[in-house]
C-alpha cells in the first residue's frame, strides 16, 4: 500500500468500524501501525500475506495489538500445534481452496512478468501456466498445485486449539461458497469428518485434479500438483440445489437464554442473553393476586419458549415465581417480545469505538544525498579481492553459508551481515541461534531480517537488525513501524516506482535493490526434487552439499525465458527472474534519498560480481540482456 493510498485505507477502516465490522484483515505494516494508533478498539487480524509461520512471529504481532493470526498455508499440523500452544491470540488456518506455489506475501512473479502484484491482491496466476525444467515448456505444470482440503482434519484442529478456518473463495461463484461453507459448517456442528458424498460434492464444486492435504501432513512432492481444464463443465445440479437453498429464508436461529423473575407488587422482569455476550433486561406488567389458579414457573417457561417466527430459539430458561400470583399470557408474551426486540437492537448496534487523531510521521531525517553500495552474495565463492577493492559498505551472506565459514576478510568500514532464511520453522530455531553465534565469532555484526519472526531470534544477539525485502516495505508508515520494532534500516519493495520511493518519508535509512535477478518465488516444494528426485532429509534443513539442486537448474516458460532455481534453507526453492535488473547507467536511483543501494548476486561468478560492481561505480550500460524491473512501470 503506497503512501498516497494510506489515507483512503484509513478512511475505509473508520467507516467499517462505525458500521460494526468484527475486524479488519491487514497485510501492510504501515497500515497496521496506523490503525492501531488511530482506531485502538478496532480488532485487527494479521493476513497470511504477512508471512507468519512461527510462534515467534505470531507473538511479535500479537504484542502490537493483533487479535488473530492467519498462518501460512504451508504450516503442517505439527507447526500449527506449536503456534497454537505458544501464541496468545487466535489462530486461523487455511482449510480449503486454492494453494499458491509461493509463500503468500513473498511472490514477485505476477508483478515482474505481468505487472499485477500478487502481494497487492492482483495476482495474474502465472503459476497455472506450463513450464519445463531444463527443457522447453511443454505440457507440464510444475508450479500448479491442487486445491487444499482439510475437511478430514477438523477434529484434530479443534483439539489443538485452532480458532478459525479460512475457506478461500476468491473469484468463485456464490454457489461454490454455499456448497463449501455448508459442508464445513455441518462437519463442525456434528463433530465428524466428511462422507464420501460430501467429498464428491466438494470436488464437483471446484478442484484441480482432486485435493491435497500434504502440507498439513508435513509431506510434499509431485503428487500435490494439479490442473483444471478450462472447459470443465459446471456442476449444474449441485449449484442449482445450492442456489435454491440459500435463496430460501433458512437463516439459522440464535440461541438465547432467558431469566425471568415474577414477584409481588413489582413489575415482571425478563433478561435475555445470547452467546456473544449481549444481555438485555426488560420489565413488564405487575402481577396480580391469583383469584383461582396461581401462576407457575412451568407455565411461564412454556410461554417464553415460543419464539417461532423470530431469529431466536430459547436454549435455556430459568423462572422464579412467587406463590399466589397471576399474570396473563398476553403479558408474558409481551415481555418475551420486548426482550427479543431489545436483544436485536443490542446485537445490531454498532460498537462505540475510539477514533483518535492521525499521528504525524517522525521527521524525514534519514534521507541520504547519495546511497552507499551494499552487496548480497549467494555463495562464499563469489567473494574476491577485486570485489573488496570496490569498497562496499556492507556484504551479506546467507546464514547457512556463514555456518560453514572459518574466517571472513576484514576491511576498515566494512560491515559483515548474516542473511537469515526467508522461511523456517520453530523447530529450526535452536540451529539458527547456533549459526548466529558462529557468525558473530567470524566478525558478523548485522543481520538481515525479512520476516517479523526474525526479530525475537535476533534479540539479545548484539547484532544490528536490518530489514530485508521480504518485509514488503511500501510506505513511510511501514518504515516508522519497523523503526519502532528496533530496526536500523529497511529495504523497500522492488515493486515500487522510482517516484514512490523518492516521495516516501525516510524515517528510517532506506535501501533498494538496484542490481540482480529479483526473487520471483520461494516455495515449500523443491521443484528439483519434484522433477529429479533426491533425499529431502539428507542434511537436515540445510542446503545439501551435493545433489541435483547444487547444479544449475532452469525453469523455462512458453516464451523460452529461463528462470534460475536456487536451493534455499529447508530444502525449499527460490525462483529468480530470467534477466538481471540493471540500473548502473540510470542516475535515478541515486536521487531517491536512499541510504543504501544493493547489488544482489545470485548466479554470477566471482569475476562477474567484481566487474558488475565496477560498472555501477562507473555508471556503465549493461553488456547483456537486462530489465529495468518495476521501478519505471510500477504494478497494479
Model-derived regions: residue spans:
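Surface-exposed amphipathic alpha-helical tracts and adjacent flexible/coil segments at the periphery
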Residues: 4-17, 26, 38, 42-45, ...
Amino acid at each position: 500500500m503506497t503512501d498516497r493510498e494510506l489515507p483512503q485505507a484509513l478512511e475505509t477502516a473508520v467507516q467499517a468500524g462505525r458500521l460494526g465490522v468484527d475486524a479488519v484483515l491487514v497485510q501492510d505494516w504501515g497500515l497496521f501501525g496506523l490503525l492501531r494508533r488511530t482506531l485502538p478498539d478496532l480488532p485487527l487480524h494479521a493476513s497470511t500475506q504477512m508471512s507468519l509461520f512461527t510462534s515467534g512471529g505470531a507473538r511479535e504481532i500479537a504484542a502490537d495489538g493483533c487479535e488473530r493470526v492467519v498462518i501460512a498455508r504451508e504450516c503442517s499440523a505439527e507447526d500449527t500445534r506449536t503456534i497454537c500452544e505458544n501464541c496468545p491470540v487466535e489462530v486461523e488456518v487455511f482449510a480449503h481452496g486454492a494453494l499458491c506455489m509461493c509463500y503468500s506475501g513473498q511472490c514477485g512473479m505476477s508483478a515482474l512478468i505481468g505487472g499485477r502484484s500478487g502481494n497487492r491482491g492482483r495476482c495474474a496466476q502465472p503459476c497455472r501456466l506450463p513450464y519445463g525444467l531444463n527443457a522447453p515448456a511443454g505440457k507440464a505444470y510444475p508450479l500448479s498445485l491442487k486445491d487444499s482440503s482439510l475437511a478430514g482434519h477438523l477434529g484434530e484442529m479443534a483439539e489443538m486449539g485452532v480458532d478459525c478456518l479460512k475457506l478461500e473463495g476468491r473469484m468463485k461463484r456464490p454457489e461454490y461458497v454455499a456448497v463449501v461453507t455448508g459442508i464445513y459448517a455441518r462437519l463442525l456442528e456434528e463433530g465428524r469428518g466428511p462422507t464420501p458424498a460430501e467429498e464428491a460434492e466438494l470436488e464437483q464444486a471446484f478442484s484441480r485434479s482432486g485435493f491435497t492435504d500434504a502440507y498439513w501432513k508435513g509431506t510434499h512432492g509431485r503428487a500435490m500438483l494439479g490442473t483444471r481444464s478450462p472447459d470443465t463443465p459446471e456442476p449444474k445440479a449441485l449449484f442449482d440445489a445450492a442456489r435454491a437453498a440459500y435463496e430460501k429464508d433458512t437463516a439459522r436461529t440464535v440461541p438465547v437464554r432467558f431469566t425471568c423473575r415474577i414477584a409481588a407488587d413489582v413489575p415482571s422482569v425478563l433478561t435475555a442473553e445470547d452467546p456473544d455476550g449481549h444481555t438485555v433486561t426488560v420489565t413488564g406488567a405487575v402481577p396480580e393476586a391469583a383469584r383461582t389458579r396461581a401462576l407457575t414457573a412451568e407455565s411461564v417457561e412454556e410461554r417464553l419458549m415460543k419464539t417461532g417466527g423470530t431469529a431466536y430459539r430459547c436454549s435455556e430458561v430459568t423462572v422464579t415465581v412467587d406463590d399466589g400470583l397471576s399474570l396473563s399470557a398476553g403479558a408474558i408474551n409481551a415481555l418475551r417480545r420486548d426482550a427479543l426486540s431489545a436483544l436485536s437492537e443490542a446485537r445490531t448496534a454498532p460498537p462505540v469505538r475510539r477514533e483518535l487523531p492521525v499521528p504525524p510521521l517522525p521527521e524525514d531525517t534519514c534521507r541520504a544525498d547519495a546511497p552507499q553500495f551494499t552487496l548480497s552474495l549467494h555463495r562464499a565463492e563469489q567473494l574476491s579481492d577485486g570485489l573488496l577493492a570496490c569498497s562496499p559498505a556492507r556484504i551479506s551472506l546467507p546464514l547457512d553459508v556463514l555456518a560453514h565459514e572459518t574466517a571472513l576478510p576484514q576491511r576498515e568500514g566494512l560491515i559483515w551481515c548474516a542473511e537469515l532464511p526467508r522461511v523456517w520453522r520453530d523447530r529450526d530455531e535452536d540451529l539458527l541461534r547456533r549459526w548466529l553465534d558462529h557468525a558473530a565469532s567470524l566478525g558478523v555484526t548485522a543481520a538481515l531480517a525479512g520476516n517479523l519472526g526474525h526479530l525475537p531470534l535476533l534479540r539479545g544477539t548484539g547484532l544490528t537488525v536490518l530489514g530485508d525485502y521480504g518485509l514488503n516495505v511500501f510506505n513511510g508508515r511501514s518504515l516508522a513501524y519497523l523503526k519502532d520494532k528496533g530496526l536500523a534500516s529497511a529495504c523497500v519493495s522492488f515493486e515500487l516506482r522510482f517516484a514512490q520511493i523518492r516521495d516516501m518519508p525516510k524515517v528510517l535509512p532506506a535501501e533498494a535493490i538496484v542490481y540482480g535477478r529479483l526473487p520471483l518465488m520461494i516455495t515449500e516444494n523443491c521443484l528439483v526434487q519434484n522433477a529429479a528426485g533426491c533425499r529431502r532429509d539428507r542434511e537436515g534443513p540445510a542446503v545439501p552439499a551435493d545433489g541435483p539442486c547444487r547444479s544449475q537448474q532452469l525453469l523455462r516458460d512458453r516464451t523460452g525465458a529461463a528462470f534460475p532455481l536456487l536451493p534455499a534453507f529447508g530444502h525449499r526453492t527460490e525462483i529468480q527472474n530470467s534477466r538481471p535488473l540493471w540500473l548502473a547507467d540510470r542516475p535515478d536511483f541515486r536521487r531517491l534519498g536512499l541510504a543504501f543501494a544493493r547489488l544482489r548476486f545470485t548466479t554470477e561468478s566471482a569475476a562477474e560480481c567484481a566487474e558488475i560492481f565496477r560498472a555501477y561505480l562507473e555508471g556503465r550500460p549493461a553488456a547483456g540482456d537486462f530489465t529495468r524491473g518495476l521501478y519505471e512501470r510500477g504494478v497494479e
